Curated annotation (Swiss-Prot):
Gene: xylA
Top enzyme class: isomerase
Binding residues annotated for Co(2+) 2, in chain numbering: E268, H271, D307, D309
Active site, renumbered: H101, D104
Record's protein name: Xylose isomerase
UniProt KW keywords: Carbohydrate metabolism, Cobalt, Cytoplasm, Isomerase, Metal-binding, Xylose metabolism
Position of the signal peptide: none
Binding site for Co(2+) 1: E232, E268, D296, D339
Cofactor annotation comment: Binds 2 cobalt ions per subunit.
Binding partners and assembly: Homotetramer.
Family that this chain belongs to: Belongs to the xylose isomerase family.
Source organism of the structure: Thermoanaerobacterium thermosulfurigenes
GO biological process, one term: D-xylose metabolic process
Gene Ontology MF annotations: magnesium ion binding; xylose isomerase activity
Amino acid sequence: MNKYFENVSKIKYEGPKSNNPYSFKFYNPEEVIDGKTMEEHLRFSIAYWHTFTADGTDQFGKATMQRPWNHYTDPMDIAKARVEAAFEFFDKINAPYFCFHDRDIAPEGDTLRETNKNLDTIVAMIKDYLKTSKTKVLWGTANLFSNPRFVHGASTSCNADVFAYSAAQVKKALEITKELGGENYVFWGGREGYETLLNTDMEFELDNFARFLHMAVDYAKEIGFEGQFLIEPKPKEPTKHQYDFDVANVLAFLRKYDLDKYFKVNIEANHATLAFHDFQHELRYARINGVLGSIDANTGDMLLGWDTDQFPTDIRMTTLAMYEVIKMGGFDKGGLNFDAKVRRASFEPEDLFLGHIAGMDAFAKGFKVAYKLVKDRVFDKFIEERYASYKDGIGADIVSGKADFRSLEKYALERSQIVNKSGRQELLESILNQYLFAE
């Protein structure tokens, strides 16, 4: 295939000294580390929406992107051309996976029946390409936020007709995700939240959200979909306050409604930023609670208060992210999906490759540094020593449950003074830099 990206050949690993912009400097998919290839460890995925449907439109200006597959006038012809362009891109960049929203791959019709017919046509085309492609589907999802019908939300809408439509749309999205061999299914509630509590029954909306998710679980069982269900936290945008604010918020919701046995989380770096968390914080909280399912790999601008979805190029960030993934034991069904878009001024088709190469190299380098940090137990050894007071004596009594307030008071009264030790943050940050910049 060489129709839409004629100026780009297959992207290959050439090493860190290469001056070829269309090559991997750190991502060698065939390199074996700890018994698995880099490709198997990282499980990279291309986001269909940012890569093939985004046109550069923003609130202040029109489309800028040069996308040769968009020259048709019929929306279905554009959708078919996008499939051709997508698989040419997947092949040239050697992508293991891609992700999609239902409305990314096929246009809406005038009715739900017509929309589903459009989906069936494009899904059949994608299935044909999948037969000869190494690329697979990491996850599918439904766009329950763009159409004006979702102005008050989808499953949390005050309008029961919208709830019903949303259910029908997710039903179809689950079916096509299963049909395409998707390994996960994602729920992101962009409109599941509120602008003001003056007109909102929060308790009822959360109850309905849970009812909706239970229906999805039941239908997945009915059709035999064995993929992992994921919720993607985000605190705001487009809604002022979204119900899936952050990992802790999502986990509390899942536990309250007896959904935690079915769901994990898909964590996006830029969404962590919007929740005023470090990316690693969200990953760590999910990991220690056993719900880290997948990652949307991007980054945000710390000086801006909205979701910029930039390609991740900060090796420190990717290292600390992959540190959590490695400590988890690696991905199961999840992966690293580049929910990232080239900048509005990076409008040429070739920029799509350059953006993904930058992100893939950044995570590959981060993975290798993180693997060495874990193997050398750099932080583990320090942390074990820092909490050593709980290994014996009164600390061991606290951990085992032997201690109570009376015994702890007696112990405290008998101590003349408390001696703390330094946290050595600066030392650890310096050691991290040693690993980051080691040759």
